[in-house]
Regions:
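Conserved short submotifs of the Hanks-type protein kinase catalytic core
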Residues: 108-119
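ATP/Mg2+ or Mg2+-diphosphate-binding catalytic cores
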Residues: 2-12, 17, 60, 161-172, ...
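A cross-family kinase active-site recognition segment
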Residues: 121-183, 207, 317
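A conserved alpha-helical element in kinase catalytic cores
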Residues: 12-22, 58-107, 124-132, 136
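Catalytic-loop signature of eukaryotic-like protein kinases
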Residues: 213, 217-219
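Protein kinase catalytic-loop region centered on the HRD/HxD motif
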Residues: 200-208
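ATP-binding glycine-rich phosphate-binding loop
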Residues: 28-50
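Active-site Asp-x-Gly
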Residues: 209, 220-272
């Protein structure tokens, strides 16, 4: 059955359910919550449990296979990575010290609890500057002692299943675009799924713990300085993944900072590969549009740009 687009009423109801679950979970953990407020509502509903200095992130837009256990496992990894970084005095938004550092499940949602920080609303995002800070983060993450899955952030199952589902949605994607994305993904997927295949395709490219989700974009300008945030997709992979789709200026800024840190420069061939994976994932994201209708317009510029580009990023390229 083809999923229908969620109406504004259903979207609002989903937000309300997530808000109510976050408040109930917070109160269940002993927090005082009298004036909760939704701070963000896109892929997750982010709730400030005011007056408690706690923010809850409740993922709401998810692949069909991402059950509670899958979500909780991913969230435990995030909490472990961020807790370790905080212990090393790396500037992050840390888990809340007022509750156990574990995902909480309530009313069908799996959520995490974070320390509330005041944001400096006068600061404009500067992704070139932030890309320099990503090199600092990578230098710190190299010492992370925990185990991380290889390129789990690429979510190959999501891309494979998303592209398959779009075969029945010509209203969401042009069939010619979908055909191209599936052909490109057929080449890229084996290297994304297998560390051994990646290392064979890109010999000499070291792997390390990564943020996993555009860290230059996920740096929060707090009143006490810049803070790394949103490690939901923490993974093991090449550093190029964290610079995907940011462009030459950000890449140059990262390389400059990496050189000062004694880290390797970005590899152009790996970047082409990573960006090609990202473009296939962008097309696959249209499969989530029934859950999040704004994706149709939000993804259109990226897909139009991809349509005019050659595919030159195969592992053997």
């Amino acid at each position: 059955m083809t999923p229908e687009f969620m109406t504004p009423g259903r979207l609002a109801a989903r937000t309300s359910r997530a808000l109510e679950a976050a408040v109930a979970a917070g109160r269940g953990l002993g927090l005082t919550v009298t004036d909760p407020a939704v701070l963000h509502d896109v892929f997750s509903v982010v709730v400030h449990l005011a007056p408690s200095p706690v923010v809850v992130r409740v993922p709401t837009v998810l692949p069909t296979y991402a059950g509670l256990d899958t979500r909780a496992a991913q969230q435990r990894t995030e909490l472990a990575v961020v807790s370790w970084l905080a212990e090393q005095s790396i500037p992050v938004i840390p888990p809340s010290p007022l509750v156990p550092q574990e995902p909480v499940q309530r009313d069908g949602f799996s959520m995490t609890f974070w320390q509330f920080v005041e944001q400096d609303t006068t600061v404009e995002p500067d992704y070139v500057h932030n890309s320099r800070l990503v090199a600092d983060l990578h230098a710190a993450l190299r010492a992370y002692p925990g185990d991380l899955p290889f390129l789990s952030t690429a979510e190959p199952r999501f891309t494979t299943e998303g592209l398959a589902a779009l075969a029945y949605r010509p209203d969401l994607v042009d069939p010619a675009d979908l055909d191209r994305a599936r052909r490109e993904w057929e080449i890229l997927e084996p290297v994304v799924r297998s560390r051994a295949a990646f290392e064979a395709a890109f010999p000499g490219i070291d792997l390390q713990p990564l943020h996993g989700d555009a860290p230059a974009v996920n740096i929060v300008a707090a009143t006490n300085g810049a803070l790394y945030a949103d490690f939901e997709l923490a993974t093991l992979g090449p550093v190029e993944w964290d610079l995907a789709a940011l462009g030459p200026a950000c890449e140059a800024a990262y390389n400059s900072a990496a050189q000062l840190r004694g880290l390797r420069q970005l590899d152009a061939r790996v970047l082409r590969f990573i960006n090609a994976v990202g473009r296939c994932r962008t097309v696959a994201c249209l499969a989530l549009a029934p859950q999040l209708p704004l994706l149709v317009e939000a993804l259109k510029p990226s897909i139009e740009q991809w349509r005019g580009m050659p595919f030159d990023a195969g592992p053997a390229g």
